[in-house]
Amino acid sequence: MTNKREDVRNIAIIAHVDHGKTTLVDELLKQSGIFRENEHVDERAMDSNDIERERGITILAKNTAVDYKGTRINILDTPGHADFGGEVERIMKMVDGVVLVVDAYEGTMPQTRFVLKKALEQNLKPVVVVNKIDKPSARPEGVVDEVLDLFIELEANDEQLEFPVVYASAVNGTASLDPEKQDDNLQSLYETIIDYVPAPIDNSDEPLQFQVALLDYNDYVGRIGIGRVFRGKMRVGDNVSLIKLDGTVKNFRVTKIFGYFGLKRLAIEEAQAGDLIAVSGMEDINVGETVTPHDHQEALPVLRIDEPTLEMTFKVNNSPFAGREGDFVTARQIQERLNQQLETDVSLKVSNTDSPDTWVVAGRGELHLSILIENMRREGYELQVSKPQVIIKEIDGVMCEPFERVQCEVPQENAGAVIESLGARKGEMVDMTTTDNGLTRLIFNVPARGMIGYTTEFMSMTRGYGIINHTFEEFRPRIKAQIGGRRNGALISMDQGSASTYAILGLEDRGVNFMEPGTEVYEGMIVGEHNRENDLTVNITKTKHQTNVRSATKDQTQTMNRPRILTLEEALQFINDDELVEVTPESIRLRKKVLNKNVREKEAKRIKQMMQENE
């Protein structure tokens, strides 16, 4: 009979984006008495970085711990977005059970499926929380049936299918085992976790085994490895061995051990089997590596991380406006920042190219890479990035590309247009149903390159009423056809100067304008989207000729259409292969790779000729 540590439970909270997972963790923290009576607590306290708070999403996995009646519950809050799935997979190794949070109205969504699949593969015990039960449109019974169907589809074992269900309202801080009535607190959730999630095995008297699952960095203590003690004990000052991924061994001394209490990371002297801790002392510690005693070097199985599916080129900013707005503009500074990102983000890959000021950066998806760019921009970096490209992989001699599972809910009158547009992007319909409130729910498998830039088109097609989610499904044999991409050409500035109201008014018939009057522009910069398929070079700096002749009708007031200001994501989705996005702390500009019109036209002719010769 193996001993268990009944005073500890290790759980991960998984859910789809925006189903209330981080709010639920906040309430668990508050009700466990972690905060003082007079302590101010931010909403969504676990989403600690600015972008997480702005977008209302969790990007990095976070640890916290609460005490309930003498039992310490270690909670890992995981990202709900598949782009950050690299984090999710490693967390599953650190815990013994998962709390699956599902919206009482929306039910199961693609990301729920992605993360749950990882949890079931690790044989973890699930507890299902049907959240937002207080919503008027809640349909708890239907959602529980959907969850059961999903478990069966993901080949859960019999024990996992017997999952307990807790009905909760995280915003109100209430829960119960009965969907019809709510208790005043989350007590039923705490007790369900303690009753159903297995306690960790207590083998503290055996030789130490600690595996790193997440990384952090601190200017004072350097690199920090976060993980679980699987066996034995670890004390500050211990001399231990680190078994690297390639099998080599490095010795180091444990300088600090941190435990988690509420949102704080506190220094502790000792940790034992079953504890989730952070360790410092080894500079180049990496995810998946094992810490053991010198005399008992036994590595744990290496953690497998999903490969990147999307890549883009990062370049030093060489536009005419380079260096005007950013603090960090050189190749060395950008290289250092990318290396720093690699310290903690294991789903990211950075490769050098023939050019010293260009790098290929590969990640798990558009969101993953755009959040890195947004972070760099806010830190004062200037750079240029290319259109995202999917990564082609050779599997058993066949060239394969990533496919995504797309789930969308649209008003019935828009369903035909959405089906047609996904079909044009080589999507394959898996399912089509009508929801209780009359929306059409569509499920497609679509090549990932077909989804680049699709969200904007989808939103305009459904007039903002549609909901779309997509997540990586698998690699499949590559489709040879051209998929997706922008159909219209660009309006390109022919000159450097300031955009004038007079010129913008004259261009409104030509397409959609991106510029406010007075915006500085340069030759080769994209200032709008053309109505037609070809690019058009325009003079957006043209001013009205002043004469001393007055005209009675000429100066009547003209109204100008509001310019379309692109966000970073929209800019990345908009550009074509021969274009770049220039990113600075103050601006997001679009430009052609070749700024000069004559050189650009010669290059286009040359490429066209080569293609004809190859045919």
Model-derived regions: residue spans:
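Structural and coupling elements of P-loop NTPases
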Residues: 1-615
